[in-house]
């Protein structure tokens, strides 16, 4: 019989622009579920062995891995990823540049 310690757990994010924001929320729910499940298995310090992504998913993976590398824990990683997306959602002020709206409407 193979024990659960013999398995590696991978987290893979896909690409798709704004889908990355959805992935942040999905990751938070998934992380909470796994954290609760792993409390008695000794995995709580290493929720995922492999983290990968493509396109915007690679950005999500980078945010998570850099957080875990700096803080030495997965705890707080979901909040950090959501914080990243909330920061992206704030106004940039680009629409205040004279002529931008007309340019955008023309090319959009």
PLM region spans:
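An N-terminal RHG(E/S)-centered segment typical of histidine phosphatases
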Residues: 1
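Patatin-like phospholipase
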Residues: 4-10, 18-108
């Amino acid at each position: 019989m193979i024990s659960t310690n013999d398995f590696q757990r991978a987290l893979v994010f896909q690409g798709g622009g704004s889908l990355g924001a959805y992935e942040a929320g999905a990751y938070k729910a998934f992380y909470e579920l796994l954290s609760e499940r792993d409390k008695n298995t000794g995995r709580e310090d290493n929720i995922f062995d492999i983290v990968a992504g493509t396109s915007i998913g690679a950005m999500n993976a980078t945010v998570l891995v850099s957080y875990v590398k700096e803080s030495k824990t997965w705890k707080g990683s979901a909040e950090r990823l959501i914080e990243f997306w909330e920061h992206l959602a704030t106004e940039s002020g680009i629409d205040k540049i004279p002529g931008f709206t007309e340019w955008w409407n023309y090319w959009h």
